[in-house]
Amino acid sequence: MPSTRNIETHNDSNPTLRALSLSALGIVYGDIGTSPLYTFKTVILLAGGGTPAVNTIMGSVSLIIWTLIIIASVKYIHFALRIDNDGEGGILALMSLLSLKLKQRPFIIAVGLMGAALIYGDGTITPAISVLSAVEGLEILSPSLKYYVLPIAITILITLFAIQSKGTATIGKAFGPVMAFWFLTIGILGARGVIQHPSVLAAINPIYGLSFLFSNGATGFFILCGVFLCVTGAEALYADLGHFGTAPIRCAWFGLAFPSLIFNYLGQAALVLEGASTEHNIFYMLCPGDFLLPLIILSTVATIIASQAIITGAFSMTRQAMQLGWLPRLRVTQTSSEGYGQIYIGVVNWLLMLATLGLTIGFGSSEKLAAAYGIAVSATMLCTTLLLFIALHKLWKWDIITSGLVAGLFMIVDASFFAANLTKFINGGYIPITLAIIIYSMMYIWHKGYQTIAIKQKEKNITVASFLDSIQKERVVRVPKTAVFLTSKEQDIPPILVWHVKKNHVLQDKVIILKINNLSIPRCKPGDRLQIVETGTGIWHAVANYGFMEQPHIPKLLKKLEAQGYDINIKDITYYIGHETIFVRNVRHTLSKYIKILFVFMHRNALPMSNYFHLPPESVFEIGRQIEI
């Protein structure tokens, strides 16, 4: 079984565990924790609205409860959290782990990348539907306020995206306590409804859900679209494993989040059983009138926190994809020294903002947005289940039957939700699916194009022996300086070094040929960071290893090398990097031509290598060359 975090061995009295569990409430459970704002309301509307029958109410809430149990508690909390890639979770980390150890690499990578692309697709909807559903509580406070809902939601979203570059480390410390208060509040409100109509507790029996599902034909099938909304944030349970570890996530779930959600959904169902109107948001009707405005404010803050988690997750996943070679280099800004996860990627932030605002304005209400929400994340969960099956069989060494039975249960549930959500395609579900296809295509095109360039560059490499022989024959002068040449191959001499000697007829007496090696693990062990070997007189070949959660910083790396006794002066280094100009010529096939043109566009707009590796501009020498693809 793959290793798990040491924190898992701590007991409940451990103050570190309690602190991490509190933090997990603010980051991990924001999305799933704000789902009661719109889930039960959507389910009742899909069931026909109006005054629903008792079996409809009981069946609906029973399906919600058991979806939370099967998907969130069993699939993600019990199984997925135990399959980590050196402590990291999420579909890209799982893809990297499996592709590193198994032979089914193309299939695993295709499934993993599609799952990641789908997360981006639904990630544009989550902030919109969450904030809208919270602000819509104003309509219950006063019907005349409904005209202000959309402008307020847009203002909140713009502000949220605008402050990302400043970092959220300071206010982020309050996320955990705020979400803890949120879960306590919704749990108490729900318990209040259950006390008024305790017979609703019978819905915990799964027979109610199954009976409603199979005895109501198309209606029973369609409401699965609404039921699924209760677990749209479940993928975050796995993705945030690296931030907190297994034990805090489990502790926060079973200790507060899960019981609070169950009580709230039961409370909403109890309220409808009592005859409450379903025209307005049922969630807010649980609240006594005097406390409605504070609840609306708390709901808005909770949805902002949920949206922040989505945005931060998008930044983190983008960095992973870049380090694994599936996206071009983008500028990554560390917004806080307190945590490596505190980063900002401007391009991702503004594109996400434009997409989210477009959806908010285009759909206008959480009820309409629910028609587009869920299809992409349900497909992501299918992808995760496929990889989970492979992990159970290949990594945990379970036999094929046991692995199939466990994963098969999840597959049936996931496939049912995905099939139901496909009915949303025309009504808006095509939007996240289209976005996912675009992102997947970009990742595939970038990776294939980058591989093509790497192959063409290696063709120009020469051996160390040939290079040393040539500089001796040509009597190349060695000057007392240090030069670093970046390369994509570990052993040979890169073309930029050959060009440098050919044009300048001099060579520094200390030459480091450096390859940056991106690993399929989150972080490289300090002892494995750098391997360096002298392959010729004053010529060293070095390989620097970085995990997909790490950002290469070459000057800091070389400073450590200098501290270890190597005769280099960090202040007197010249960095030589290749600057490729890619062009397309004589492509007859139209599709192939446009694919190559897209790659050229991405390559030209990628962050320069010198910026990405934090090289001092005054010490960088770029050598240009043209490459035809």
Swiss-Prot record:
GO terms for molecular function: potassium ion transmembrane transporter activity; symporter activity. InterPro entries: K+_transporter, K_trans_C, K_trans_N, Kup. The chain crosses the membrane at residues 20-40, 61-81, 106-126, 143-163, 171-191, 209-229, 253-273, 291-311, 343-363, 372-392, 400-420, 425-445. Keywords: Cell inner membrane, Cell membrane, Ion transport, Membrane, Potassium, Potassium transport, Symport, Transmembrane, Transmembrane helix, Transport. It is a multi-pass membrane protein. It catalyses: K(+)(in) + H(+)(in) = K(+)(out) + H(+)(out). GO terms for cellular component: plasma membrane. It is found in: Cell inner membrane. Belongs to the HAK/KUP transporter (TC 2.A.72) family. HAMAP family: Kup. Transport of potassium into the cell. Likely operates as a K(+):H(+) symporter. This is Probable potassium transport system protein Kup 3. It comes from Legionella pneumophila subsp. pneumophila (strain Philadelphia 1 / ATCC 33152 / DSM 7513). The lineage of its organism: Bacteria, Pseudomonadati, Pseudomonadota, Gammaproteobacteria, Legionellales.
